């Protein structure tokens, strides 16, 4: 529902700017498939072939792929190669952020710290990585949503058990291994970027220990235990990375803070599941303004209209998000 929220607010915002909006979605439980959300709705699955069928009929000025989660963003490269104009973050920037080796090289070039990590497609590679990085490790398969298949392993026995249970591990679909930073504080940052300037919408502090998936975590805005110096450092790193990657629209960066040291966990070149909470907590409609940026507006133009308040403003409240589990469905 978080990505549904983003798509709906983007459709409303673009309609206000004079665009006709076309929604492609096959989930009947979402608001974005309501008849009055967009100008036209195609009840189609998000596959390259089905989306191209829609594009051949509609001939759109552009396609937005960064508000619906991981499924549409994986279509960006194929769509652009087929001549479809992509609005917002381009496939090259998406690849830079999502390719583990290239992103690690970027962090190294910018002198930004990250937990030691490795990629493995065989048991031997996983063992070698574990010896090099050290336990405990967070291990997870590639190309999954919602933290599915993620686990913390503490020794060789745990690692063997995980690798044996991880199906379809191939060179194209490897397992990621990251050093698990024990006793660290995890943060989510949602931001807007127009390739020239970055606006940090929120810095969310997780209430649980590091390692809970962002969408399922309890978190708080503004941060309740971090120093102003650390928050300023996180904002500065976010801006540096957003501009270096060439993001246009929304991005999300996950951080870990341990002993006053800041580590980048990953950058998502798209909307995250924390965007609705960030928007409601701060009063800044991130999805709405991201869509306007993707349509060509600049952050300084939005700021001049009074739409983007000062990032360093103080508020007299705390906003807290907690996950509500649908126990009746289990």
Question: Which residue ranges define each predicted feature?
Answer:
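Short Gly/Thr/Asp-enriched flexible loops that form oxyanion-binding sites at enzyme active sites
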Residues: 70-83
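ATP-dependent carboxylate activation and anion-phosphoryl transfer catalytic cores
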Residues: 1-60, 71-73, 88, 110, ...
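Small/polar loops that bind or transfer phosphate-bearing groups
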Residues: 43, 67, 95, 121, ...
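A conserved helix-loop-beta module that forms one wall/lid of the active-site cleft
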Residues: 89-150
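Short, acidic/small-residue loops that bind anionic groups at enzyme active sites
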Residues: 18, 82-94
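Periplasmic-binding protein-like
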Residues: 61-67
């Amino acid at each position: 529902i978080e990505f549904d929220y983003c798509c709906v607010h983007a459709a409303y915002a673009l309609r206000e700017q004079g665009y006709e909006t076309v929604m492609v979605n096959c989930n009947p439980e979402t608001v974005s498939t309501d008849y009055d959300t967009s100008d036209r709705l195609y009840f189609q699955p998000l596959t390259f072939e089905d989306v191209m069928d829609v594009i051949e009929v509609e001939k759109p000025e552009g396609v937005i792929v960064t508000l619906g989660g991981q499924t549409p963003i994986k279509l960006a490269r194929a769509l652009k190669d087929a001549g479809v104009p992509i609005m917002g973050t381009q496939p090259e920037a998406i690849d830079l952020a999502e390719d583990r080796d290239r992103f690690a090289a970027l962090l190294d070039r910018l002198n930004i710290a990250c937990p030691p990590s490795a990629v493995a497609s065989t048991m031997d590679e996983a063992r070698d990585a574990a010896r090099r990085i050290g336990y405990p490790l967070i291990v997870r398969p590639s190309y999954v949503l919602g933290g599915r298949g993620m686990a913390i392993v503490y020794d060789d026995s745990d690692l063997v058990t995980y690798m044996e249970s991880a199906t379809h591990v191939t060179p194209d679909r490897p397992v990621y291994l990251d050093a698990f930073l024990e006793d660290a504080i995890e943060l989510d940052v949602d931001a807007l970027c127009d390739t020239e300037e970055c606006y940090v919408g929120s810095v969310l502090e997780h209430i649980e220990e590091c390692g809970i998936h962002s969408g399922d975590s309890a978190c708080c805005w503004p941060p309740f235990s971090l120093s102003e110096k650390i928050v300023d450092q996180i904002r500065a790193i976010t801006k540096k990375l957003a501009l270096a990657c060439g993001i246009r629209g929304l991005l999300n960066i996950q951080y870990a803070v341990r002993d006053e040291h800041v580590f980048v966990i990953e950058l998502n070149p798209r909307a995250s599941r924390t965007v609705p909470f960030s928007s409601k907590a701060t009063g800044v409609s991130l999805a709405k303004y991201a869509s306007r940026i993707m349509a060509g507006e600049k952050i300084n133009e939005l700021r001049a209209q009074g739409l983007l308040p000062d990032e360093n403003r103080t508020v007299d409240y705390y906003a807290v998000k907690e996950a509500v589990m649908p126990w009746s469905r289990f």
